[in-house]
Every structure is written in C-alpha cells, then in structure tokens.
From Swiss-Prot:
Its main location: membrane. HAMAP family: NDH1_NuoD. NDH-1 shuttles electrons from NADH, via FMN and iron-sulfur (Fe-S) centers, to quinones in the respiratory chain. The immediate electron acceptor for the enzyme in this species is believed to be ubiquinone. Couples the redox reaction to proton translocation (for every two electrons transferred, four hydrogen ions are translocated across the cytoplasmic membrane), and thus conserves the redox energy in a proton gradient. It catalyses: a quinone + NADH + 5 H(+)(in) = a quinol + NAD(+) + 4 H(+)(out). It is found in: Cell inner membrane. It is an enzyme of class 7 (translocase). This is NADH-quinone oxidoreductase subunit D. The lineage of its organism: Bacteria, Pseudomonadati, Pseudomonadota, Betaproteobacteria, Nitrosomonadales. It holds the Pfam family Complex1_49kDa. Keywords: Cell inner membrane, Cell membrane, Membrane, NAD, Quinone, Translocase, Transport, Ubiquinone.
Amino acid sequence: MAEIRNYTMNFGPQHPAAHGVLRLVLELDGEVIQRADPHIGLLHRATEKLAEHKTFLQALPYMDRLDYVSMMVNEHAYVMAIEKLLGIEVPERAQYIRVMFDEITRVLNHLLWLGAHALDVGAMTVFLYAFREREDLMDCYEAVSGARMHAAYYRPGGVYRDLPDRMPQYQAQHTRNESTMKSMNANRQGSLLDFIEDFTTRFPAYVDEYETLLTDNRIWKQRTVGIGVVAPERALALGFTGPMLRGSGVEWDLRKKQPYEVYERMDFDIPVGTNGDCYDRYLVRIEEMRQSNRIIRQCVDWLRKNPGPIMVDNHKVSPPPRVDMKQNMEELIHHFKLFTEGMHVPAGEAYAAVEHPKGEFGIYLVSDGANKPYRMKIRAPGFAHLEALDEMSRGHMIADVVAIIGTQDIVFGEIDR
C-alpha cells in the first residue's frame, strides 16, 4: 500500500496576503496545516550595519524605512537613545509634538492594518474607508516635514520645525470644479492644529462606521473568532508585545508602565482582550484608535496654550537659526561642523523603547565617543510575532493563515531590517 505523506506548499512571497515578501513553507494534511515555516530575509537591507558608517544624524532617515507604515515612532526610539547618551532634556513643547505625532502614526498604522486585514479576509469596503482617513493624516505629516511618509521630523534634542500656521490646500484641476475645491479645502483654512482638532472631532464617527461593517458581521466573526488563539502565559513566553500581548489579556503598555516624554500626563485607557484570538486583537486595535484620538486631542489643547522652543539650545546638537547663521560667523561654523562632521556622542550604551503600533520597538546604541554609532541593534516587535506563526496556525485551514498573518500586522521592513 502506498505511503500517505503530507503535502508541502509555498505560500508567497508573491501573494497578496503575504504583506510584502513573506515566504511560508506549509506542510499540509489535506487542507489542515501541520507545520508553517516562515522564510525571512528577502527585504534585508543591512540597516544596522549602514548606520555604523553614517553620522548619528545621517542614520535618522533609515529609521523611517524600517516599519514603513509607522515612520515617526521608529524615529522616536532612535532619537531617545541618542538623547540618553547625550544626557539632554527635550523642550516640553517638542515632547508634546512628539506624543501627538506618535498617536497620529498609531492611527495611520491601525487604519492600514484594518483595511488590509479586512481585504485579505474578503471585506473590501473597509479598505476604501480606511484610506479616506489616512489621507488626512498623511497631510499632517506633509505639513510638518514636506513628506507624506518618510518624514525625518524628529531630531536629537527636539523636532525639525514648529507646527505650521497654515495647511497645504488642494489646487484646482480640470477634473474638479470650484464648488468641489471649496468643500475639499473647507477644513484647511486654519493652522495644522485646527485641522487636527477638526479630524479628532470627526474620527470617532468613522471608527463607528468600521465597526458597523465588521464587529457584528457574521462572516467576519466566523473568520476570526477562535482563530490563532494564544494564552497569556504563552504570549509572554513568545516575547509578544503591543496589541498581540494585550489581545491575550496581559495589560502591558510602555506608555503606562514605563512612561516616556509626557505620556504620564495623558488621560487614556489600555484596551485588553480576553480570549487571545484574532477577533480580540481586532477589538483591541479598534479601541486603541479611539484612545489615540483622545491623546491627540489633549496634545492639541496643550500646544495651543503653550508656545515655546522645539529644540534644545545647544549648537553642538541642534543647528542655529538661519537668521543668526547669516549674520554671525560663529553660528555658521557651528552649522557647518554639525552637518559635515556630525555630533560627537559620549562613549557609553543606551537602550530606548517606545510603544510602537505593533509592540515594543527598541533601539540599543553603543557609542565609542565618535560621531558615528559603534553598534546599533534594532528590536523589531514583528520579529517575535512572526516566530509564533507556526504555533498559531497549526491545526487550522489554509484560509485561516491569511487571517493569522493579518492579525499579526506584519511589515517586513522592520523584520528583515
């Protein structure tokens, strides 16, 4: 009698649900998964090594390109590690701006996750709705940095520039008539803070729309309830962080447990799941968007009332104002030295971690006193989550792998580094 053997199948890397360049080698018994072996490295760009050959400031744009949907939060961990080594205190206004943009980035990330996850499972409408809101938040990025994605806005000692007094406006085109242009620019007449405040007022109703489409949807629940269950003890043992850990019922959030910047002044709650399945992780991320909206609103209120510096007043770390640079030779020298040679960071080592939309994102920096990092290690939250894919998908069907990859919120820029 012929021996019955398991069937091996490649899932990805050219697969719409592979979230980039994931290659999975699946061992199947019929349609039931016996083993899932993730193959990574297809997006490896040697970011850690490249940073060793750049000055501390030149390595900053690499951070945007790690998890390329949570750009500013990546930068935040990097600049915090440098600030620890330098021993400098960031101005209060810059801290509030950072916290506000961290939360804007969290909403940006979760909107993309929600749209892509729903699309993978078969719900297309949510994808279109989510991208409608992402457009407004991308415009906030563009207003402060000039770029919609790779902002390079956070700097050691503060932020690149203060919040602008006016928003970029949509320009007339032959496809849009005057009344359309007027309505599109209606909420862009004021400052960036006015625009963000208007967004925070509208956003809860948009989240309600997503929930109407998914939360009680029979098909969505059949595809996510009881899929990819991880017990709280196992989640901790596997190194889960962020929504993956909180979805399993562990209340751990660096913004509350190890507060950085001005998070201890913020009033917000930590959503926690109970069952540790795909559905609970969906509910956690939905509620996180609502809590981020609360934090953004608090930051807007504070920033309106409190003008002030947004960079440390130390020209070894931050460039002098352009007006001074054009009138004062000493300031010109400071500017030239900072952007050619870079800052010399005292010898030592530092680890800085932030509550990234995907989990705990950490940067470990070692300095030997030179103007370049001696060593940089990136702690990517998605790396630990992808390791658990085998365990989470065993005993499930092939179709459930798509839901499990979606719930992990995988982005290969940070995993392969």
